[in-house]
């Protein structure tokens, strides 16, 4: 008897226009965001699992894809999905060998019920060449707020971390999507609180802030965002 394998992924709606597929650990695959527009669908990251690739291929409207950065869990499904347009950073372009490089901010004006959409470069310690996407009150940052990993150490460059904090403070949004984080969507102020707490550990004369399993520790993530989780469950 043939065994049928379902390739259906759970799609979570944030509002009438924005939805996403959760990240997975096995295989490691990023959260993937879908944003409906009048004449197209924007897709933020394409993930690395078959279920996500299947859902992307179920979109028959024009697809505009933005890659947050070059890591495989965010870009792997490029090889098995189609798209009308692909937007990447200069660094990501070197790895995926395709796409339009985003040097200046891309702005798609508001149109009726569809809010303004922006794609822009965002500073990051985790990976060079990160792109962010904003639609209305939501900003999606991929892994941009995470640290660089060196063995068991998680390291932030002090100067880049300060740039990250400044950029987030200037964002006109209420929520931020952080790929792989518990719950995915967090209040802007909670993300700022966490990053500022990390910045508070800087030491005079040192350009790096280093932790053993800090930002990726589930207990830390749960502690920082437990209020968000409780409110969303009510």
Where are these regions (language model features)?
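Zn-dependent metallo-beta-lactamase
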Residues: 1-40, 172, 188-194, 214-234
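Active-site environment of divalent metal-dependent phosphoester hydrolases
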Residues: 28-29, 49-51, 70-76, 93-96, ...
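Glycine-rich, phosphate-binding/catalytic loops in enzymes
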Residues: 59-60, 81-84, 156-158, 193-196
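A broadly tuned preference for mixed-charge, low-complexity surface segments
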Residues: 85-101, 116-121, 171-194
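Divalent-metal (often Zn2+) His-rich catalytic cores of metallo-beta-lactamase-fold enzymes
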Residues: 160-230
């Amino acid at each position: 008897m043939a065994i049928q394998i379902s390739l259906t992924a759970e799609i979570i709606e944030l509002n009438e226009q924005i939805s996403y597929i959760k990240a997975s650990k096995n295989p490691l695959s990023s959260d993937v965001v879908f944003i409906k527009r009048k004449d197209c669908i924007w897709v933020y990251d394409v993930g690395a699992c078959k279920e996500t690739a299947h859902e992307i291929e179920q979109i028959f409207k024009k697809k505009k894809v933005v890659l947050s950065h070059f890591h495989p869990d965010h870009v792997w499904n490029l090889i098995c999905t189609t798209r009308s347009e692909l937007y990447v950073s200069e660094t990501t372009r070197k790895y995926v060998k395709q796409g339009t490089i985003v040097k200046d901010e891309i702005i798609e004006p508001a149109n009726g019920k569809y809010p303004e959409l922006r794609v822009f470069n965002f500073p990051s310690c985790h990976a060079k060449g990160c792109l962010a996407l904003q639609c209305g009150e939501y900003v999606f940052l991929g892994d941009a707020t995470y640290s660089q990993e060196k063995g068991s150490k998680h390291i932030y460059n002090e100067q880049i971390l300060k740039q990250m904090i400044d950029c987030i403070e200037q964002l006109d949004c209420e929520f931020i999507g952080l790929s792989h984080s518990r719950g995915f969507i967090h209040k802007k102020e909670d993300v700022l609180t966490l990053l500022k707490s990390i910045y508070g550990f800087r030491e005079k004369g040192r350009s790096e802030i280093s932790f053993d399993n800090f930002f990726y520790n589930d207990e830390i993530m749960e502690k920082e965002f437990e209020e968000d989780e409780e409110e969303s469950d009510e």
